[in-house]
């Protein structure tokens, strides 16, 4: 226990008086010894008071490490998301559709399918050797496939960074396949581990996103079969990497042309018939079976089809994008108000059925963020 210098000095004064008292007693100076005894009592009382005041101040400044902080530290060290367990896991899974649909607009059916699959998984109805879930997202560009994966990572594992994204256009050649699990002995990069296995080893609780899986070399698919079936991969250093606590998602544009051609035949946004959806899914699955091998498709938890976005969906997406800009401006002390006419103007200039929501984001940047940036730099705002 480290005491302040004042208390150490008070104890030293007491020790000195005690020595003087004992010396006086030995020399039979009883009157002097009695005076020193009274002085010792006063010094001890003074020191006790100082000690009590010091303890009181120390307790007021004491830093308490509680359970939540310990969970946060362990989560940072291990990558296991312990610090978001304040909400019951069961309730989080029951509310998963609502949470996902609040961020991913126009894909209610996709959100429902993935939520049902994850509930089956967490209810111990899945094979414990396999990942939590493995999904193939099919649909045209700009409809929210990657956004759903990112949102799912945040909702399931408590942070936006709980996603490992791998662009499969980097693995189109045969010689690039080894980079997934690491270069063999004697080759450059052998000691670094694989670009996939090393990230999963460091973050075992995460969403693993393989973007545009149809571009990957066939040997990459063969490599992934073990992760999908057995929930593990062995890297070039001989370490077994556990995939059982991951959610594996692969995105693809296979069948996107079918969606565009059939927008008016059962897959229009205004039509929500399960029968029409199943018909279109059957046609898209024919395309998918031509692109991927049966042993790969059989190992997936589910294949999820994303519909094209309608103009009504764009209104909701504009609201989300404008709210993001308003929140950033609020941090700068600026309040942004965008009326309905301006929001409609953004939709009209950013709506493109073929390219989905991405042109809308560029419209928000061009028509809203650019003028705001210039006004802030010129200090030309109220």
What residue spans do the PLM features occupy?
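AAA+ P-loop NTPase nucleotide-binding core of proteostasis motors
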Residues: 1-382
